[in-house]
Amino acid sequence: MDDERDVGYKPLISIHQRLADNNGVNIGLQINQAINRLRGDLLPPEWITERLATYEQPVQEKEELHRILTQHHVLVLHAPDHPGRYTAALAALHRKVGDNIRHVRREPGEAFSAEGLEDHKTGWILDLRDEGNRLPSGVGPALLEDAPHLADCGSYLAVLAATEPWRHASKGTDRLAHRLPLPPPEEVLRAHLERTPPPVKSDRWIGASEVTAGIKDGPPAKVARWAEAIREAECLDLKKEKPFKDLVHEVVQAVEDWRAELLDWHTRHEDSAHRNYLLAAAVLNGAPVETVYGAADTLAQALGESPPPRHGQQGLGVIALTDAIDAYVTDDDTLRFRRIGYGEAVVDYFWADRPHLIKRFTHWTADQTGNKDLPDDVANQLADRVTTWALQYMRAKHGRRATQLLRDIAGQWSTSLPEQARDLLTVAAVDTGTGRRVRDAYLAWARRSDRDVPPRLKTALARACERLADVYPTMMLLRLTELAAHTEDEDVTDAVGHALTVLWDQPTSRSEIQDQLDDWSRSPEAGRRTAAHHAFLHLAARTTEDGRPVLLVAAHEDKSQAWQTARWRDLLLHYRTLPGPLLQQALNAWMNAAASLPDLQEPVLTILQHAVYQSQTDTVYAADRYLALSHLLFAWAPVQSLHPPSEQEVLRDRLLLALRQADPAVPAPDGHVLGS
């Protein structure tokens, strides 16, 4: 998901790829790669090899980075924009520790100390680019203090940052840092063309004035795009039939997204029949031509048109329309474009030209994935291609329109393509170019009512947060709890509860969840307090297969019991403002466990009793909490006067008796008081 496409960036499958045959990409693999990287897994050796294969670095610079790492075990690589910091760090660390390289697991804005990096002889990458201009002022001295620990472990740390924030945060530690200049674009282009299979002879391309003008002063990401377009042009002209100047022209147009050509084409073809056929062909590139022909009509209807029925030979046929869009029909009657990345450029043009129709268009594309006339490969890849287009659009746009597009697509897919909706929301949140804006948008959506944000979209968002919690636990916990606090929909509630349970099931996350909910419950902000109550309520209502509440996995630990007591106390205190059915479900789960699992009876009863009153700490007996728990208990085990007391009734009365005996205003009768 790293959109800093520098000289060495060539992932196994890239969401930036625009292949000549528009086969799309595997977004699921991209998500797994990004999450594995962000959570600190070892970077795959083959991925490192691929990334470094085209990396070209001046010898003097290479030695300078090696010197800083050798002397300090910490290297800060900073630059104003995108000159290849990531690959430079990867290369410097690889020289020191080989393939034993990991990312530092850290949420944006979270405090960092290298003392938590315990692995020996490991190269660590700490990516602070997502912090923007918000680097803490003492980062430089803190890194210098961490250097001895890294040296003791035989490990090395490479930090990636922007130049201006680093300048303010370095505080006299510039000896750790190196400002990375832009590499010569011609050498970047040569490396990409000659070292990536299939290799392309670079001399004639570097000698073309249009190419050198296009890459001049360009960051590696831009040069890599030129190399990609050149390789595609060569692949489309295997027979060497096109004059070289025509190939150069196509490459220039492709890098510019065919915008000038498409503007001219749309000016000459004002009728929607041509335009809809072009857009349908772009989306369904590789589909049977008759399927594209029919899809153009359904697209017209989806966009609000009323195309007249074509009887017999009325209107243009597939030959004329296909020729008009500069495509061709293959021997197996499928439609293909002749130009590099043309299909994707057509969609980009439509989104820029008709933003008010994006919602209708994405609804139509979602419908096409179920088109029985589409070959499986085209249908299966369509959602991935739309995801790719959406990410490219969002990287280019920085206003509300970008996240609105994401919401529109995910909202459409959440009904018919829920898995793809979850994938889209996940990949957008871990993409370097869109992630921070998108994660902020998710928090805003989570705080909206079911009327403002449809429950199906909230369900997809909860499921995306569940996946993202693996790398952003605190951040996703907040979004999940806000979702819980602003919905009345059962599906959303269930998705949130499941996500919170998955998060709780990670032993390393439990203490973080406890601390976070503690902080939120004491927050002066009412919204944070409400979020804490809802988060605990959802967790309290979840059980294992044998009926054991998930929160009672560590019920015999004093800290856990104290934490659960405090959280149950909050629930009873806010009894009237919480979702009644869910609160009753949680109480039922705990009391059922107390009744059926002997090892849980004492912990459950003690926690619930102390949630009402604890003599060691409470100076006043809280009657409101007693009444709330009493109401819940009688709903769990109603009075059945015509029958002998059930086991549930006996347990209910035992707890209520203990609570009455604990009331300091009531003379204590003889007998045992539970938990005293």
Language model features with spans:
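N-terminal pre-Walker A segment at the start of P-loop NTPase domains
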Residues: R37-H66
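Extended amphipathic alpha-helical coiled-coil/heptad-repeat regions
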Residues: L374-Y575
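Long, low-complexity intrinsically disordered regions enriched in small/polar
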Residues: M1-L43, E490
